[in-house]
Every structure is written in C-alpha cells, then in structure tokens.
C-alpha cells in the first residue's frame, strides 16, 4: 500500500470504529433484562416483536469432573447467542429473564438413585407449574413469543416444559417453545460428536447420555476453569443402549457419568458448540418466520416409545408421588392444607 492509501485508511479507521461501536450499542440496547427494567419500560415493549427468553439450568450431578451447574452455563451461553441473533432482525427486541435453576430428573435417576450429591431436582408437577405460571403472567400481559432454553435431557423434564408451552399456545394464541427439547438441534450436536471421533473413540464413547466426551468437551470450551484435570484419566463407562446405561448407573460405585470423558478436548468442544448453537439459533429464527414447532419431533415424545426410557420415567414419577405424599402429610399435620 502506498503512502496515500495508508493516509486514507488511517483517516477512515476512527470512523469505522465509531460506526461499529454504534451498531454494537444499538444491538445491545435491543437486549433487555427484565430484572433491570421498570413498569413503564416493560409496558412499552412491542409485544409482536419482543421475544422473551427463559433460560433454565438444573442443578445436577455431573460426576467428579464437571460442575453441578454444567447445564446452566451452557444455557446462559445459548441464551446470549440467540438474543444476539434475534436483535439483528430489524425492529425485534429480546427480553431476558433471570435463569431459573430448576429441573426434573438428574441422570442419577437412570439407576433409580434418587439421592445423589450434586442433584437438586424438583418434581415434574412443580416444574410444569412454575412454567405454566410464567406462561400465564406473560400471556396475560400480551407477550406472543417465548423461548425456553433448558438443555437438560430428561424426558419427563422436557414433557413438563412442552406441556407448559402447549398451554400458552392454546390459551393465549402465542408461541412458548421448549427450544432445546426439539430434536433437530439435539441431533446436530450428536452428529457432530460422531464426526469428530475416530472409530476407536466412538466405540469407547458408546451410547453416552451424560457428562461424556461430548459434554466434557463443551465445558472445556465454555468453562475450562470448572473442569477437573483428572478427566484425562477417567475410566470409561461404556454402554450401547439405554438399557446398558441403566445397568451401569445401578452399580454401587457408579461415579455419575457415562462414556469416556478422557477423550474430550476444548477444540472438540468448540466445534461441537458452534455446530449445535448455529442449528439451535437457525431453528429459533425459522419459528419466528412461521415454522410450526408443534410439527417438529420432540425429545419428550420420541422417548415414550423406548421401553427402557419409559421404565426410568415411570419410576421417577412414582418417586415424585411418594415425595408429594410426604409433603402433603406434613402440611395436613400442621393444618396448612
């Protein structure tokens, strides 16, 4: 580049920086956090072009190498990336709610271990009621678009969120979608993991539903400070089916994970995350453009047809009933019905 070109670039650089700063500021201004807003600011939101994001994050054991809030950290990142994508659309705003740290069914329930350090789950009926209550509040205030971001994979958990969303649709005519319960985004993540591994690694990872190479890689990418270095020596707990995972999780000293975390890497996590996040955002934007999410396959529905999953889910619901009975008995004894 000649001296004249250098002078032109030098002169334009501050202008370009200013323009980029303005665009970034405008985008950030379109992402609102309800906890920071007053009554008039919330009332002024255009209901037809405001998307409410409800991030969640079950506190769930993830074995000896990952934090109990692993799902929550992923949901926080997904929420931010989705918000950024939505406000790129002219006229659209995002209203972000504080993360709700509640969920149904830790992976420990796969082995019928309903008490497990690190898991602090709520009952199916509780989670459904929480999100139905929020659906009522949002629907009564005229909001039309609500996305729930709650990556946890337990079928009962996803059914609770799906049912709350269906209630919102049927009662208020809007859209409240359990985005992470739709299969297209989940399948993209699983496919990416398979493509990243050698045949030998795929055999070692097996059918892994929790805290495996896949999830450990994602946490190494997102929150490496919270991943214990000992994952590199983690012995595999490999299954080929959900029935295998039940048998593994029932063993006395099961550590809380499946598959082979030792295969994980931050580089793999970056690839997995980017592919999954891109597909997740793509599906959300398609829904805003008119795609009927109720015609898409849902994790909670598909797993009903798998006998091993049904066994786990039914046992979990029976445990829920037992817990509810204990609580109700105490309330009756205190005259608090």
Where are these regions (language model features)?
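Extended, histidine- and acidic-residue-enriched regions that form the cofactor-binding/catalytic faces
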Residues: 28-146, 151-337
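N-terminal secretory signal peptides that target proteins for export/translocation
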Residues: 1-9
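Bacterial N-terminal signal peptides
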Residues: 10-24
């Amino acid at each position: 580049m000649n001296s004249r070109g250098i002078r032109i670039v030098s002169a334009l650089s501050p202008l370009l920086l200013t323009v980029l700063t303005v665009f970034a500021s405008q985008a950030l201004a379109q992402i609102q956090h309800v906890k920071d807003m007053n009554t008039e600011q919330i009332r002024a939101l255009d209901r037809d072009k405001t998307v409410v994001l409800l991030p969640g994050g079950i506190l769930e054991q993830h074995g000896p190498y990952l934090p109990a809030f692993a799902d929550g950290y992923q949901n926080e990142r997904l929420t931010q990336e989705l918000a950024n994508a939505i406000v790129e659309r002219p006229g659209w705003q995002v209203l972000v709610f504080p993360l709700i740290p509640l969920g149904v069914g830790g992976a420990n329930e796969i082995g019928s271990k309903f008490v497990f350090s690190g898991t602090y789950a709520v009952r199916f009926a509780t989670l459904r009621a929480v999100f139905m209550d929020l659906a009522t509040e949002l629907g009564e205030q005229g909001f039309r678009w609500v996305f729930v971001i709650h990556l946890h994979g337990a079928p009962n958990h996803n059914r609770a969120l799906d049912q709350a969303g269906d209630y919102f649709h049927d009662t208020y005519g809007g859209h409240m979608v359990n985005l992470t319960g739709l299969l297209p985004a989940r399948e993209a993540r699983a496919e990416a993991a398979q493509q990243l591994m050698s045949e030998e690694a795929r055999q070692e990872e097996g059918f892994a539903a929790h805290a495996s190479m896949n999830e450990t890689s994602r946490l190494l990418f997102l929150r490496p400070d919270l991943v214990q270095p000992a994952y590199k020596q983690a012995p595999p707990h490999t299954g080929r089916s959900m029935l295998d995972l039940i048998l593994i999780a029932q063993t006395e000293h099961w550590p809380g994970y499946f598959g082979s975390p030792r295969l994980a890497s931050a580089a793999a996590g970056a690839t997995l995350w980017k592919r999954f996040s891109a597909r997740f955002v793509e599906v959300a934007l398609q829904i805003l453009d008119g795609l009927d999410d109720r015609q898409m396959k849902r994790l909670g529905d598909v797993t009903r047809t798998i006998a091993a999953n049904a066994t786990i889910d039914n046992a979990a619901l029976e445990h829920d009933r037992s817990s509810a009975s204990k609580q109700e008995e105490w309330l009756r004894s205190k005259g608090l019905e």
